[in-house]
């Protein structure tokens, strides 16, 4: 008889091992066997929980996305209620510690690449893109006409993605302070122009 709560403990252990495997070997080098080895369990257990490598990547990305959405919610709740503060909170969530570690950044890059070929991953990417745009647009719409708010949200989302991508590809720790400053300056520019 399985222990109560063991399923979630095991899944978390395997997701952590997947993040480490992608960090060390890339997505092509990440297999059910490499994940099992890092987690010190049998390949059969990995298959039992996730089915195959695609299922493992999907579960890992759902975990990373939950961390992002949790950081976004936490930071928005803690922010002052004005649009500038709440926009800055959304930006900060995208550069949260849960999103800028080497294993997570490499997993994001692998996910984006793979999402062009896998319908389930593509759907997850679309959900994430829509959620970011919706959060940004809702805040910009409090200070700008709706058409301008949509445009501003698209621009800020592109800036967030671009700053994050440049940071991820820089080969060292991401300079979150510099990224946040650029994004904050952009927000200030847009809100001042109204």
Swiss-Prot record:
Residues 31-50 bind DNA. InterPro entries: BetI_C, DNA-bd_HTH_TetR-type_CS, Homeodomain-like_sf, HTH-type_TetR-like_transc_reg, HTH_TetR, Tet_transcr_reg_TetR-rel_C_sf, Tscrpt_rep_BetI. Residues 8-68 form the HTH tetR-type domain. Transmembrane segments: none annotated. GO terms for molecular function: DNA-binding transcription factor activity; transcription cis-regulatory region binding. Signal peptide: none annotated. Keywords: DNA-binding, Repressor, Transcription, Transcription regulation. The keyword Transcription regulation applies. Pathway: Amine and polyamine biosynthesis; betaine biosynthesis via choline pathway [regulation]. It comes from the Bacteria. It holds the Pfam family TetR_C_6. NCBIfam families: betaine_BetI (TIGR03384), PRK00767.1 (NF001978). PANTHER family: HTH-TYPE TRANSCRIPTIONAL REGULATOR BETI, HTH-TYPE TRANSCRIPTIONAL REGULATOR RUTR. Repressor involved in the biosynthesis of the osmoprotectant glycine betaine. It represses transcription of the choline transporter BetT and the genes of BetAB involved in the synthesis of glycine betaine. This is HTH-type transcriptional regulator BetI. It comes from Burkholderia cenocepacia (strain HI2424).
